[in-house]
Regions:
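Post-Walker A alpha-helix
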Residues: 114-115
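A noncatalytic interaction/capping subdomain that flanks phosphate/NTP-handling catalytic cores
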Residues: 1-107, 120-126, 131-187
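Conserved glycine(s) of the Walker
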Residues: 109-111
Length: 187
């Protein structure tokens, strides 16, 4: 697999020779447009991974595990996006009536579960796993990932990438059983 993605002001070549990682990589980068020229790269091979962001090659010897690859790609994207007005974070964003709610939490804390439950209350999922936020004057969602992990299943949601102002931030510790709770958000 070989694809080039336009991320902010950089073009990232992603090259992978491990077929079982292709879907993860494509899903992880689905929020970005593809292009044809690159100025930085990540090359994932059976016995080593090489990446270059700021003119220096970094080499990781050995085959990356699925979970390590997920983190590495997120860190590379963060390195490209993060500056004084932009941040790329592990989060979700839901929206109703042009009011966005940023949901923060650790891996497997229940962000996707909360997103699914919010649909019942009329919310729309704008970002399922990673969010590119812009905070020039107010906090806005610039782009959101379409990759939704829920109950050990993975799917691509039809997330919109429209800018949405974030009106509230919700930090989640863990969601164990949503059948005993009613989803309600006060205005």
């Amino acid at each position: 697999m070989k694809k080039i993605y336009s991320i902010k002001d950089r073009n990232l070549l992603v090259e992978c020779s491990i077929n079982e990682y292709d879907e993860l990589i494509i899903n992880r980068l689905s929020m970005f447009e593809q292009t044809d020229k690159y100025d930085c790269y990540i090359k994932i091979k059976q016995n080593k991974t090489i990446f270059r962001i700021n003119s220096v090659d970094q080499i990781i010897n050995g085959q990356l595990k699925h979970t390590d690859l997920y983190q590495l790609i997120n860190n590379i994207i963060s390195n490209i996006i993060n500056d004084s007005e932009n941040v790329y974070i592990h989060s979700a964003v839901i929206e109703k009536n042009n009011k966005g709610i940023l949901i923060l939490g650790d891996f497997n804390s229940g962000k996707s579960t909360l997103c699914i439950e919010s649909l019942k209350a009329g919310y729309q999922i704008l970002s399922a796993d990673q969010s590119w936020l812009n905070y020039k004057n107010n906090l806005f969602l610039k782009k959101g990932s379409k990759y939704l992990a829920y109950k050990n299943n993975f799917e691509i949601i039809d997330a919109c990438n429209e800018k949405c102002e974030i009106k509230a931030i919700f930090i989640i510790k863990a969601v164990f059983d949503t059948s005993n709770y009613e989803f309600y958000i006060e205005n």
